Amino acid sequence: MHTHTIFVISDGTGITAETFGTAIMAQFDTKSRLVRIPFVDTMDKVHQAVRQINHVAESESHKPIVFTTLVNQDMLDLIESQCKGKVFDMFGTFVRPLELELGQKSLHRVGRFADISESKEYLERMEAINYTLAHDDGQTHQDLTGADVILVGVSRSGKTPTSLYLAMQFGLKVANYPLIPEDFERKQLPPALVPSRKKLFGLTIDPQRLSSIRNERRPDSKYASLVNCRYEVAEAESMMRRSGIPWLSSTTKSIEEIATTILQEVLPQHLGH
């Protein structure tokens, strides 16, 4: 398997270029090492990036691959003319053809988050993250009616990372609540969740996978035993069926896939539907 160094160069955080570049490289059977160089907003920083790329090009057997979202044309020209990597100009690939199609020049705004820190969208996103952190793992029952969605499931089924992803990526207020043995004995949802039943979405997981995850945290405990994990998962799924709660298994799905399914099922308007 070939090994390539992938550089991601941006005048902002580099998140856009990294996400896009990673998705493209996933189509190839090649092992890669990713180097993100964010906030390249001066010519000095461009020269530093070029030196870093060229050093790798001279020390490795394969030419580095460079994904860039630089907006400044002079900086981009310097990268393309002086670096010894294969450069892919992501903005140029899409923005310049769009300028022709739309009949107008792009705004050439530098950085994904330029002038966003005081915007309504940004402030709402920060509020959503704070809400989600405060309502993680059933920490509080207060203001559950303010949640956009409430995730339920057994402990370690993926509720917390999914909640934070939905908050950070979509600005959603997400509470998550663990289903525990006491709930299974009562055969009922936790009382605090009943008024918000329509906002509930369940996560389940393969018992063997759950046991493996729990053993990393509390090895050789009843909590992590396969017998207990089978019991909890079966009871949780039964409870979700009885309560009419939509749910999915997180066993083989990425957080992005889980989040998108939740949006489709519960909040389709956030997908533009």
Curated annotation (Swiss-Prot):
NCBIfam families the UniProt entry points to: PRK05339.1 (NF003742)
Binding-site residues, ADP: G153, V154, S155, R156, S157, G158, K159, T160
MF terms (GO), sorted A to Z: ADP binding; ATP binding; phosphotransferase activity, phosphate group as acceptor; protein serine/threonine kinase activity
Protein name: Putative phosphoenolpyruvate synthase regulatory protein
Catalytic reaction(s) noted: [pyruvate, water dikinase] + ADP = [pyruvate, water dikinase]-phosphate + AMP + H(+); [pyruvate, water dikinase]-phosphate + phosphate + H(+) = [pyruvate, water dikinase] + diphosphate
Pfam families given in the database record: Kinase-PPPase
Protein family (similarity comment): Belongs to the pyruvate, phosphate/water dikinase regulatory protein family. PSRP subfamily.
Record-listed E.C. numbers: 2.7.11.33, 2.7.4.28
InterPro entries in the cross-refs: Kinase-pyrophosphorylase, PSRP
Nucleotide-binding is among the record's keywords: yes
Annotated function: Bifunctional serine/threonine kinase and phosphorylase involved in the regulation of the phosphoenolpyruvate synthase (PEPS) by catalyzing its phosphorylation/dephosphorylation.
Domain of life, per lineage: Bacteria
Annotated keywords: Kinase, Nucleotide-binding, Serine/threonine-protein kinase, Transferase
